[in-house]
């Protein structure tokens, strides 16, 4: 997205303050990406569309939950983008879970320098529920297949009184993953067409339960 700040602000539908933070994050990302592998190098030339817009669509799908968990945060998509957007909401917070120490260090710098509302947990995804007891939304991008993601998310989504919603980016083969997942779980599913890549989707999942074995 080679555009002026005004054009970007209009296209992304964000405030000038949020755009400033997104642009600062973009600069940090490009600097750090020279030394550590944050995303596929082939996507760096289209950073805004492939990663920023792709991440922003998740935030727009949500009913503005206060507490997010982003699993396998990697280069910060969608976790840091969500945290930046939540900067305008005083009670919002994003927990970024990333076990790679170099990537976790980058995420800390990104949060600190942009003033985004979040914290970094340099732990394995499986350990996250014991550190983060509750959340209202879960996100993950390019982390695992849907069944594994639901296993990771189950401690939050199956908790008594939970209304946690999950948002997972998936490619064109998403239906195969859904078909596999329904053999173990029941859930409400909404498929949102990706605004970035044809045939890709964001899966919105709620009311998760495990199927009872016969």
From Swiss-Prot:
Its EC number is 2.1.1.170. It catalyses: guanosine(527) in 16S rRNA + S-adenosyl-L-methionine = N(7)-methylguanosine(527) in 16S rRNA + S-adenosyl-L-homocysteine. It is found in: Cytoplasm. Gene3D superfamilies: Vaccinia Virus protein VP39 (3.40.50.150). Its main location: cytoplasm. One of its GO terms (cellular component) is cytosol. It comes from the Bacteria. GO terms for molecular function: rRNA (guanine-N7-)-methyltransferase activity. Pfam families: GidB. Keywords: Cytoplasm, Methyltransferase, rRNA processing, S-adenosyl-L-methionine, Transferase. It is an enzyme of class 2 (transferase). InterPro entries: rRNA_ssu_MeTfrase_G, SAM-dependent_MTases_sf. S-adenosyl-L-methionine binds at residues 72, 77, 125-126, 141. HAMAP family: 16SrRNA_methyltr_G. Belongs to the methyltransferase superfamily. RNA methyltransferase RsmG family. Specifically methylates the N7 position of guanine in position 527 of 16S rRNA. This is Ribosomal RNA small subunit methyltransferase G. The lineage of its organism: Bacteria, Pseudomonadati, Pseudomonadota, Alphaproteobacteria, Hyphomicrobiales.
């Amino acid at each position: 997205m080679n555009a002026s700040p005004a054009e970007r602000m209009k296209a992304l539908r964000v405030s000038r303050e949020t755009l400033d933070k997104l642009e600062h994050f973009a600069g940090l990302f490009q600097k750090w990406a020279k030394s550590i592998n944050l995303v596929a190098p082939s996507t760096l030339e289209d950073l805004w569309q492939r990663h920023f817009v792709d991440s922003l669509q998740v935030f727009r799908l949500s009913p503005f939950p206060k507490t997010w968990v982003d699993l396998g945060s990697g280069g910060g998509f969608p976790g840091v983008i969500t945290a930046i957007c939540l900067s305008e909401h005083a009670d919002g917070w994003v927990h970024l879970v990333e076990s790679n120490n170099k990537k976790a260090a980058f995420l800390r710098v990104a949060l600190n320098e942009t003033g985004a509302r979040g914290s970094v947990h340099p732990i394995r995804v499986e350990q996250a529920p014991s550190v983060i007891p509750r959340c209202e939304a879960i996100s993950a991008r390019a982390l695992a297949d849907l069944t594994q993601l639901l296993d990771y998310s189950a401690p939050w989504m199956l908790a008594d009184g939970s209304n946690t919603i999950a948002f997972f980016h998936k490619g064109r083969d998403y239906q195969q993953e859904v078909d596999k997942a329904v053999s173990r779980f029941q859930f409400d599913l909404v498929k949102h067409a990706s605004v970035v890549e044809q045939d890709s989707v964001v899966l919105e999942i709620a009311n998760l339960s495990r199927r009872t074995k016969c």
